[in-house]
Amino acid sequence: VIFSITIGIFFAFAITKTVGYEKIKNNTEYNKNLGAQTIQGTSMEDLALQNFYFLKNQDKKPNVKAESYFVGDVENGKMIIEKNSNKKLPIASVSKLMTATVAEENLNQDEITIITQKVLNTYGQNGDFKLNEKIRLGDLLYPLLLESSNDAAEAIASHGGRNSFIGMMNEKAKSLGLVMTNFEDPSGLSINNQSTAFELFKLTKYIKEHRKD
């Protein structure tokens, strides 16, 4: 549920607002929106199964000032528009998507962890945790993703050994073919947490495909 909320908000905003593209799912809608057209070499049966993207305002080209971006369809992996999408850059709190993924796939969500002073010393106050507070690991995913809590990220990573957890984050990236992605901490405070726009899209697509009901 958390993954669905996070991914849905991000991609709906990116496609319909920032870039100005709209998605249509079949040839009937395509003709209705753009007028009757013939696409050479493509059967009507194939067209009915495809998605199309078009600028809602043909006179206004996308104006995205970001240094790097990748907008794609997480259902089929197709690119809609991109700019420097293979450029490696610091990813800050987007790191928490991998933190949540590794935590959900490798840790017992019902185990209890204790909030330590080291966790509370992490930069940022989101989460409103108290010293020696006992909290279920699964419950830490909510402040981690919805509040971008650095304390929650550290609490999760420290539960079974911080270095081991970060190692699992990097191993997961490697297993997904994210060759330009690396993590030095679970929160994204380190500028050495880096990736590319395209590889973050791949990670998001993986999360969508493997999210739990």
Where are these regions (language model features)?
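Short, intrinsically disordered, charge-balanced linker/junction segments flanking boundaries
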Residues: V1, K208-D213
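Active-site-adjacent loops and short helices of periplasmic peptidoglycan-processing enzymes
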Residues: G20-F198, K205-H210
